[in-house]
Amino acid sequence: MTVLDEAGSSAGEPTDARGRVAELAGIRAQALAGPSEKATEAQHAKGKLTARERIALLLDEGSFQEVEQLRRHRATGFGLEAKKPYTDGVITGWGTVEGRTVFVYAHDFRIFGGALGEAHATKIHKIMDMAIAAGAPLVSLNDGAGARIQEGVSALAGYGGIFQRNTKASGVIPQISVMLGPCAGGAAYSPALTDFVFMVRDTSQMFITGPDVVRAVTGEEISQNGLGGADVHAETSGVCHFAYDDEETCLAEVRYLIAMLPQNNRENPPVAACDDPADRRSEVLLDLVPADGNRPYDMTKVIEELVDDGDYLEVHERWARNIICALARLDGQVVGIVANQPQTLAGVLDIEASEKAARFVQMCDAFNIPIVTLLDVPGFLPGVDQEHGGIIRHGAKLLYAYCNATVPRISLILRKAYGGAYIVMDSQSIGADLTYAWPTNEIAVMGAEGAANVIFRRQIAAAEDPEAMRARMVKEYKAELMHPYYAAERGLVDDVIDPAETRSVLINSLAMLRNKHADLPSRKHGNPPQ
């Protein structure tokens, strides 16, 4: 038997079929083993798994079918002609997650540092095309050093092909990027075009220009993790949707996410068996949410009480914490939940919260996931920084996303729903299919105190006791325009419900809306605020 060496040369070839099969087995063994045991040990020493180990954790056992395993680059110069390892540093193929097809590519950092060259890129292009054609999710396991400099502009063109396919696949198949090493420059742009980004603390970083360039240009001293680590992108930039302490947990959560998503935009999310009664009453909700609108509470406790078995997956958990975006199930059906978080900034909408929720609403709409919105919002965050930062433009993103969504949309007002923020948070007037409210609701243009100061300004100023007059006017305004049934009497709320019945009301409403069909005007595409 003769096996080709890294340079692609051999001393002889087998002449019979059995010999050729034996030769193939040897070549495959070489491709599966990777460059060397030393390279594997170096990868493990960094607390990182190899590409094949990662794929094994992601996919169902024994389901991976590799393609282009024997691919080699054809570059010359800089000694590349003498080093032509199989796979060219990226492993591509498909398998299953809980029995459903998923396509995957994984950079092999042991080969050229996972850097992208021409052959490497075309392998990725092919698997992306296959995923789009098959209508199945695509997961990228990223651990690469950017473009392969030795191959010059061909490597850059390879990135262009990836970006083009990311965009083509957007809203068609779920795209999930898992960052498992340093990813700089072009390697960071592809994940930004996908639906979800996962990162692992201490081992994964994303940035356009690294610490050395930052130091040279600006004089700032910063580490890789300080510049683009998992915590930075999960808490500050919003680039990362999920951050975990180790690869095993990270990949397990990727599997969990995939199980909640449809295969493509033409299918509905999978339905799971549910033992949690659809008509389960939740008396505890009255204790979780204070009737006093000025008292904070944790909205996640409300979500836990409403959804199946208290189980949900929060997206962007640590970024823009004044709003919650989560995937959960109601009677086995996947739903997207958008909820104000009174525990942080009183649940106001600001620039980051608007962007976070808008992106989530668009994702849900693209993949046929009904949206449940839980409102307790006192308005938009005031301030010079917000206005100069473009709160009008950013807030309009959320407004546009809701107005453009054709999936079933149900809104529930728990307490405050004030002003423009109330309208933006999927009010009936912008197309919510059903709007419910608890008897603790306060729906108004603004809070009673502010409204009284505007409407009764002269009476308050002329009163012998302005504070007493103000208190009286506030009480009068609340009684006249903010009582719990004011909006329902005018048809702006479909029903005022007992909080304990919320779960059953939501489930019954979603069942009714399951076959909802809505058409948008014919157009090439909208022009949403950016």
Predicted regions: what is each one?
Residues 1-530:
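Ligand-binding clefts of soluble mixed alpha/beta catalytic domains
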